[in-house]
């Protein structure tokens, strides 16, 4: 297994875990003291602050990611139109290299598991499993698939997803992939396509190879010399990787914002429940103390 790591490192975001409270049940108020409930409330409020902050950051990044995605898609559509007009057909059979586009970041719902599920579904067929190798962009999908098909791994890339992807980053990735993909008949790209602010679609896209470009029936209309075919394919491949990374990054930011919004709402609901329980417990404690005082005063009278 060959592991390729990009030199462009991303800023790492702290990981947050919501830990359950052992020995405490909200349905049994008598089991918890006022101090315990107060500690739980404080912890949940801190988590709520963190989730709201992550949501705000994700919302800001989503706006920038959408602009970057729209720009990359316009550029890719113009590039892809050339091959469509030339009648280029991407290969659909043969030894396959499947490129999964994800990232190293979590706290974004099912954005990574959806890619893993699609790949597992494709590799469920024994013939496909035998003829397919994996190239993974990002640690999340790599970790998920490592338990399922470690023998299928061929290339992995880390430090993906820190900021909006650049064409330079996509070019580094595509160059490394093409350098080690000479023995493959087809290359398939798996990524999350941005649909709206609340949804995404996991898709597979067949990419053009040098052989497919050489066999294009109408390519001669562009008067392209044969020695340009290979650089043209490399540019088209880098363009496709860049567009997919921009789509995946935008989908990730949207999913993270939605996940943190749901987490903030859940934290708010828990705060309300524990606040009610705290007030009831405190009221019961005060009532019991008043009863003890009145009872003691009556016994002395």
UniProtKB/Swiss-Prot annotation:
InterPro entries: ATP_synth_F1_ATPase_gsu, ATP_synth_F1_gsu, ATP_synth_F1_gsu_CS. GO terms for biological process: proton motive force-driven ATP synthesis; proton motive force-driven mitochondrial ATP synthesis. GO terms for molecular function: proton-transporting ATP synthase activity, rotational mechanism. It is a peripheral membrane protein. Keywords: ATP synthesis, CF(1), Hydrogen ion transport, Ion transport, Membrane, Mitochondrion, Mitochondrion inner membrane, Transit peptide, Transport. GO terms for cellular component: matrix side of mitochondrial inner membrane; mitochondrion; proton-transporting ATP synthase complex. It is found in: Mitochondrion; Mitochondrion inner membrane. Mitochondrial membrane ATP synthase (F(1)F(0) ATP synthase or Complex V) produces ATP from ADP in the presence of a proton gradient across the membrane which is generated by electron transport complexes of the respiratory chain. F-type ATPases consist of two structural domains, F(1) - containing the extramembraneous catalytic core, and F(0) - containing the membrane proton channel, linked together by a central stalk and a peripheral stalk. During catalysis, ATP synthesis in the catalytic domain of F(1) is coupled via a rotary mechanism of the central stalk subunits to proton translocation. Belongs to the ATPase gamma chain family. F-type ATPases have 2 components, CF(1) - the catalytic core - and CF(0) - the membrane proton channel. CF(1) has five subunits: alpha(3), beta(3), gamma(1), delta(1), epsilon(1). CF(0) has three main subunits: a, b and c. This is ATP synthase subunit gamma, mitochondrial.
């Amino acid at each position: 297994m060959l592991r390729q790591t990009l030199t462009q490192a991303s800023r790492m975001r702290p990981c947050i875990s919501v830990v359950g409270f052992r020995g405490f049940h909200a349905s049994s108020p008598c089991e918890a003291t006022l101090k315990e409930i107060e500690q739980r409330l404080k912890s949940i409020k801190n988590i709520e602050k963190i989730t709201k902050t992550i949501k705000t950051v994700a919302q800001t990044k989503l706006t920038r990611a959408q602009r970057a995605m729209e720009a990359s898609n316009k550029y890719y559509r113009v590039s892809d139109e050339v091959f469509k007009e030339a009648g280029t057909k991407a290969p659909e059979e043969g030894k396959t290299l499947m490129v999964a586009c994800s990232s190293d970041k979590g706290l974004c719902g099912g954005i990574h598991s959806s890619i893993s599920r699609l790949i597992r579904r494709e590799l469920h067929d024994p013939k496909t499993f035998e003829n397919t190798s994996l190239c993974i962009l990002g640690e999340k999908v790599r970790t998920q698939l490592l338990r399922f098909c470690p023998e299928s791994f061929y290339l992995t890339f880390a430090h993906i997803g820190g900021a909006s992807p650049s064409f330079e980053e996509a070019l580094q990735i595509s160059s490394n992939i093409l350098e080690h993909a000479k023995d493959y008949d087809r290359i398939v790209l798996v990524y999350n396509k941005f649909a709206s602010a609340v949804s995404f679609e996991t898709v597979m896209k067949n990419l053009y190879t040098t052989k497919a470009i050489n066999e294009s029936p109408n390519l001669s209309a562009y008067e392209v010399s044969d020695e340009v075919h290979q650089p043209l394919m490399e540019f088209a491949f880098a363009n496709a990787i860049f567009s997919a990374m921009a789509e995946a990054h935008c989908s990730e930011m949207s999913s993270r914002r939605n996940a943190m919004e749901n987490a903030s709402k859940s934290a708010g609901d828990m705060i309300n429940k524990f606040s009610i329980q705290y007030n009831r417990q405190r009221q019961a404690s005060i009532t019991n103390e008043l009863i003890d005082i009145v009872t003691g005063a009556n016994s002395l009278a």
